[in-house]
A protein has these predicted regions:
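Active-site capping/gating regions of soluble enzymes
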Residues: 1-155, 159-165
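Acidic, glycine-enriched catalytic cores built around paired aspartates
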Residues: 156-224
Length: 224
């Protein structure tokens, strides 16, 4: 999709951007991932007799996604710029939570019925590598199902105003350290992938540390 968009717009003399946060004057750009599981033409997420229509399988899937969220966060937010999107009040999540039809939560359950019930992962930005994002979603969900995990009660109301919630990683440095130590990531994605991805992102972090930004020039050129 990204390559196609760039090719089409190049013909019109334009360049699209998939940065998670292009401007500090605007909200960021998301890359939310909607997920549902089906067997023999029927959703295994749906149970008409259960609260919110969520089957036991879906509850375990959500629980796994929640547990995996901080450990796999770097796969959803792979760039230094990614973390500028997670700002309170911007419709981007800031805490590790799940909820029913709540756009301030990281994981949003949408349950209109048996054909539409799904989990919306609201963490990924527009800069996500969709293949890695899908893999991370499936890894967390599968871990939850295989381990028969159960989620905590869903968060309600404005998550931005809630207290005592587990924060999401604030920087790529934090996210990479969590990924590097994650047994879940290594079990489901493999040591070779994790080691390569971590090394690649640490190289990116070092490049960023050495860069002198326009903000620094405006801030300090005359003042210091």
């Amino acid at each position: 999709f990204k390559s196609g968009a760039k090719e089409v717009l190049a013909q019109a003399g334009a360049v699209p951007t998939f940065m998670a946060k292009y401007s500090d004057q605007m909200d960021g750009c998301s890359g939310h991932i909607h997920q549902s599981l089906w067997r023999d033409g029927e959703s295994v997420f749906w149970d008409a007799s259960a609260e919110h229509g969520m089957s036991d399988t879906m509850r375990s899937y959500v629980a796994g996604a929640l547990v995996a969220l901080p450990e796999l966060f770097a796969l959803f937010a792979p760039n230094v710029n990614s973390y500028k999107r997670y700002v309170s009040g911007s419709w981007a999540p800031t805490a590790a939570t799940w909820a029913i039809e709540n756009r301030t939560s990281s994981l949003r359950v949408i349950a209109p019925g048996p054909n539409g019930i799904r989990l919306e992962h609201r963490v990924p930005g527009a800069d996500v590598n969709s293949y890695l994002g899908f893999a991370a979603c499936l890894a967390g969900g599968l871990a939850g199902i295989e381990r028969r995990l159960q989620p905590p009660p869903p968060t309600s109301g404005n998550v931005y105003a809630a207290e005592g919630l587990a924060p999401l990683p604030r920087t790529l440095d934090q996210a990479i350290e969590l990924l590097d130590r994650s047994e879940l990531a290594r079990d489901y994605l493999g040591d070779a992938f994790v080691d390569h991805f971590v090394a690649m992102r640490r190289w990116e972090i070092e490049k960023h540390r050495r860069a002198v930004t326009e903000w620094e020039r405006r801030r300090y050129f005359e003042q210091v």
